[in-house]
Amino acid sequence: MRYEHDSTATVLADSYNGKKLNSPNDVVAHPDGSYWFTDPPYGGQLYEGEPDGAGGPSNAAGKLNPRIGQPAGFVPGKRELPTNCYRIDPSGRIDLVVSEDQVPDPNGLAFSPDYTKLYVISTGKGPGDTDPGGKGDMSVFDVSADNKLANQKRFSDFMIDGVKCGPDGVRCDVNGNLWVSSNAGRHVGYSGVTVWAPSGQLIGRIRLPEVCGNICFGGPKRNRLFMAASQSLYAVYTATQGAAPG
């Protein structure tokens, strides 16, 4: 969805090959005018949206009632597509760039400052979901001049001191470091933000008293990190700037 200056809204993508998207989650812009986005299943699950109709991946046994809590006339549907990543070309064409087989349940994604690398986070499946589900890690791909991806590698498994610091959102700074929001569950002191060098080495942490869902750099100098947590919005000034075109 793109909001225009006259307050109208333009739908950029709602389907792929005639099948409706799941629940587009995170999006990044490319200097060539394209938009790259992840399409995980979370909006089609009980705890974040409404479950599939009976027999769907998030309601395989058919015991959940997707109509509860919905307006009159709501018609439940079923997931139609795997959890993939897509690219919206400036022409409007939609291309599949990362498949569910490569990165199941994709979530946050980010380009390196020179746009030669794409980082994609894979999060775990939701309660009751029967899709493949991710492992709470992040992959990195090489990006060619024609926007083809190759050489997938695991960037990090996000295990710190034996604690799984589950990743969600990711942003890159001008030095190529990756800032990743962290969900460590009940492990006190491990939720917040982890910071990684391009080599995959952990170089910093920001500890928050809540699970951190997503992050972004902002402010007049793009040196302030905003952190959206479970019930709060945090901000901190950093000694770097968020990467962006121009």
Question: Predicted regions: what is each one?
Answer:
Residues 1-76, 82-83:
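Asp-box/WD-like beta-propeller blade repeats and closely related beta-sheet repeat scaffolds
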Residues 1-7, 87-92, 175, 184-207, ...:
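Flexible "stalk/tail and boundary" regions
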Residues 3-20, 84-105, 141-162, 193-208:
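Blade-edge beta-strand/turn elements of extracellular beta-propeller
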Residues 8, 17, 35, 43, ...:
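Surface-exposed, flexible loop/turn segments at secondary-structure boundaries
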Residues 17-35, 71-72, 76-84, 94-120, ...:
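Beta-rich, blade/repeat-based domains predominating
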Residues 40-42, 123-125, 133, 143, ...:
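Short loop/turn segments immediately following the C-termini of beta-strands
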Residues 47, 82, 128-139, 188-193, ...:
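Structural motif
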Residues 140-148, 237-245:
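Short loop/turn segments immediately following beta-strands, especially the blade-tip
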